Amino acid sequence: MGECPFAHQANVDRKRVPAAGFGTKNSDWWPNAVKLNVLRQHQAKSDPFNAEFDYAAAFNSLDYDALKKDLTHLMTDSQDWWPADYGHYGGFFIRMSWHAAGTYRVQDGRGGGGEGQQRFAPLNSWPDNGNLDKARRLLWPIKQKYGNKISWADLLLLAGNVALESMGFKTFGFAGGRADTWEADQSTYWGGETTWLANDVRYEEGTKNGGDINDLKNRNLDHALAASHMGLIYVNPEGPNGEPDPVAAAHDIRTTFGRMAMNDEETVALIAGGHTFGKTHGAGNPDLVGPEPNGAPIEAQGFGWTSKHGSGKAGDAITSGLEVVWTSKPTEWSNLYLKYLFEFEWEHDKSPAGANQFVAKNADAIIPDPFDPSKKRRPTMLTTDLSLRYDPAYEKISRRFLENHDEFADAFARAWFQLLHRDMGPRARWLGPEVPKEILIWEDPVPTADYALVDDRDLAGLKQAIFATGVEPSKFLATAWASAASYRDSDKRGGANGARIRLAPMKDWEVNNPQQLAEVIKALEGVQQQFNSSNQGGKKISIADLIVLAGNAALEKASGLPVPFTPGRTDATQEQTEVDTFEFLKPVADGFRNYGQSTDRVCAEQILIDRANLLTLTPPELTVLIGGLRALGLNYNGSSHGVLTHRRGQLSNDFFVNLLDMSTEWKAADGGKGEVFDGVDRKSGQKKWSATRADLVFGSQAELRALAENYAQADNADKFKKDFVTAWNKVMNLDRFDVKKSNIARARF
């Protein structure tokens, strides 16, 4: 980004810079204060298209074949300013794509290549992304040519796919549809270390519940993370903490790849397939490498890692510090990686940069030099490559792939496709002529509606039938919210479409009140059966639609306002649900329903903000939803915490009015734990209310209090109701990628 050189002179630091955004900040005074910045990301003001650009339409107008042809040409169009190894950029672009997508983690769905974040800090300056700025610069003429029809997010991944194809590999397919963002993501927790490649914090946190931080073969990584070091995508290729121990490295590999939702077979396929191509770079002293893009001077124009070792490029290039070429044909698809892995015995060696690696013992020099045809070298491997041989489970898979090349190719194609698309969400988002026909379970597939959808006349009758079941309206509201609010925008999983709330694992989550949920689902199944069997001109309705419709009908009753509804959701089956990874959507705590409490590291209100970010909520939307959900009484298990109203079940702004009432004093009510509070009358001392941290934050955090005051005003009672209905409708439709935004029914008052 170009650091200001003057800030380093005369002991000037950022706190002394008299310019916008500098000086001592609120976060310096109150580092643990609740921050709302993650709820203001990716807004229209930071988007040059003002959020009105239809990327799907633009992509569908793209000459896809011409783009791929240009990318294929680029692979062998070596540039003097960054020459291609072996005259082919294939391995380079594979690494770029892999590192763009490989930050994904299944725990919270964040990371991944879905937003083109590799262009921004910190990812653009991670040590593991060294010199990938050059890969993006090589792509720029193509991006410039095709413009808005191909996003950076799609291009960064498509380039890797084309790279594989240009070297003789048959890929599984490719789907476009990733719209670009225009600012660095602030929501992802990458760890607590403040030094590149450090890992003390993540393993200290990981071993709090057991394990030994010094036991490299068994240590536990922080549950929130998926990389073994700050600034790495997965693991240290030299081995755990730089120790060249392949068996210990296998433990780190299994942990980090597993947190990307990859099993052992997919992990072996990815490593063995990816390392069939290209090389690593460690030609000399790494101290001669300059600062990363974000730390480079302004004249570098975002070009980082400039090296003073020789020419700094080609045969003099230094990236990871490792100097490894895996096969004798690094620009061709082959089984040579696995062949060499088992054919040779390996001995510890050091790269010219001093990094730990391995070289084939007593082997001939059969590996070509990337720039000098007259030179050869012995086969080399990374510590983490040897894990595929010396870890018993990995070895079994690796030997099977060695003996069955077609099986290996298919496994790599599938694993690579999953790597690039895991955070794409439902197939309705997938665009382009290379979308594979095979449905994969990790897509969270939902059936296509093969029937006529209901209209307004049908909806009126269905609402009557819903209320005729005798189920309390609040239970319909609770189920609709639980279903829709399971969505997370990070990887587009969850949501109401599919009605997975009636399937394992969601149906058994404590937060969803399984007994009440079963009652609601049974009632709605009766309504569905009656309607669908009546053969209303071929019309049918799904349970997914009925869950939302029932919630909407109950909200109309509670608010007196019309609530828009867009039909078309369908019902997934248990066989279409990947239970083990869906379990990661289960909330530890949920402030929207006053469920759970703070952890030893995160306060309940911070968990609430994190959840609001995953729901793409703005601060006003978060505020109005909390106020409305409390008034409606939608707490977990019927709790009265935060229900600051004597009209429970009616949509009102009472939560804000009573929260801000200065006649009430709040006191801890849980023995000093600071999770539950009583609101008592200042004069009489009589208890009036109870609340949690997720409630009181709307009176304590200044920005949230300002919004609470807005909704508590006498002239904003109606505005509150309308804003709540609008925000409710947004959440109900967050996963409706099957419908254009312009076709989703909007609240009209």
Curated annotation (Swiss-Prot):
UniProt PTM comment: Formation of the three residue Trp-Tyr-Met cross-link is important for the catalase, but not the peroxidase activity of the enzyme.
EC number assigned by the record: 1.11.1.21
Keyword rRNA processing: no
Intracellular or extracellular location(s): Cytoplasm
Pfam short name (any one): peroxidase
Gene3D superfamilies per record: 1.10.520.10, Peroxidase, domain 2
Nucleotide-binding is among the record's keywords: no
Classification via PROSITE patterns: PEROXIDASE_1, PEROXIDASE_2, PEROXIDASE_4
The record's free-text note on cofactor binding: Binds 1 heme b (iron(II)-protoporphyrin IX) group per monomer.
Cross-link Tryptophyl-tyrosyl-methioninium (Trp-Tyr) (with M-260), sequence positions: 98-234
Subunit structure of this chain's protein: Homodimer or homotetramer.
The protein's name in its UniProt record: Catalase-peroxidase
Gene: katG
